[in-house]
């Protein structure tokens, strides 16, 4: 999976590749879906969500430019898989999930696998998690109309934020914001993606009809 799906498509950070090799992707999937764990595609989990394809997880993690001791915030825990990958590289990970069943399952699985440096919270991810701020890096596993101001405010000067952003729920561009100053952000385009809508006070208020948006989440 790592060489064919990830390294061959341009992800080269050795720490990211090592984390993708180490974390047992199948452990975060329902038993009937485990044979699909290493396919180059999203895989259904629960609550009508999916685990993102391996390449997308690796791409977003690499784009955070992690240094090894980073304080990281993830919005959209999903299965907990991406948080585990982050946990292999960062110093501490806080992940926020709005769907209670997913948050509970992710917390249990991460604890079972020994990821004690990953904290899972059930909340509105568009508001971030101020209690553990500021963050060196923030990654958002859902697409919103814009980057929430609460997330920008919780990013350290010099910090990086990676998120899918789009004017509707059909498709987004993956962007990286780097905070250069109190109100100064550099924006970079990383590619085109499709993700589940980011629902919440600073995101979309409701999803579009089922079937119209690709549903990807960590």
Swiss-Prot record:
SUPFAM superfamilies per the UniProt record, alphabetical: S-adenosyl-L-methionine-dependent methyltransferases (SSF53335)
Keywords, alphabetical: Cytoplasm, Methyltransferase, S-adenosyl-L-methionine, Transferase
Enzyme Commission number(s) of this protein: 2.1.1.77
Catalyses which reaction(s): [protein]-L-isoaspartate + S-adenosyl-L-methionine = [protein]-L-isoaspartate alpha-methyl ester + S-adenosyl-L-homocysteine
Alphabetized PROSITE patterns for the sequence: PCMT
Molecular function in Gene Ontology: protein-L-isoaspartate (D-aspartate) O-methyltransferase activity
Record GO biological process: methylation; protein modification process; protein repair
InterPro entries (alphabetical): PCMT, SAM-dependent_MTases_sf
Pfam families (alphabetical): PCMT (PF01135)
Active site: 52
Source superkingdom: Bacteria
Keyword Cytoplasm applies: yes
Gene3D superfamilies in alphabetical order: Vaccinia Virus protein VP39
Subcellular location: Cytoplasm
One GO cellular component term: cytoplasm
Family to which the UniProt record says this protein belongs: Belongs to the methyltransferase superfamily. L-isoaspartyl/D-aspartyl protein methyltransferase family.
Its job: Catalyzes the methyl esterification of L-isoaspartyl residues in peptides and proteins that result from spontaneous decomposition of normal L-aspartyl and L-asparaginyl residues. It plays a role in the repair and/or degradation of damaged proteins.
Descriptive protein name: Protein-L-isoaspartate O-methyltransferase
Organism: Rhodopseudomonas palustris (strain ATCC BAA-98 / CGA009)
């Amino acid at each position: 999976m790592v060489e064919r799906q990830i390294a061959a498509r341009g992800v080269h950070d050795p720490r990211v590749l090592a984390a993708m090799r180490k974390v047992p992707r199948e452990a975060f999937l329902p038993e009937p879906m485990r044979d699909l764990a290493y396919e180059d595609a999203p895989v259904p989990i629960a609550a009508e969500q999916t685990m993102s394809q391996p390449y997308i997880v690796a791409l977003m993690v690499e784009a955070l430019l992690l240094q090894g001791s980073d304080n990281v915030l993830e919005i959209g825990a999903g299965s907990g898989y991406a948080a585990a990958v982050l946990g292999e590289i960062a110093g501490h990970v806080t992940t926020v999930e709005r769907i209670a069943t997913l948050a509970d399952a992710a917390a249990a699985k991460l604890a079972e696998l020994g990821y004690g440096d990953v904290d899972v919270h059930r909340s509105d991810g568009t508001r971030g998690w101020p209690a553990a701020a500021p963050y060196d890096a923030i990654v958002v596993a859902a697409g919103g109309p814009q980057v929430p101001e609460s997330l920008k405010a919780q990013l350290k000067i010099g910090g990086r934020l990676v998120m899918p952003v789009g004017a509707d729920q059909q498709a987004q561009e993956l962007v990286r914001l780097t905070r250069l100053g109190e109100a100064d952000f550099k924006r970079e385009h990383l590619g085109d993606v499709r993700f589940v809508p980011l629902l919440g006070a600073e995101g979309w208020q409701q999803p579009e009809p089922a079937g119209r948006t690709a549903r990807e989440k960590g």
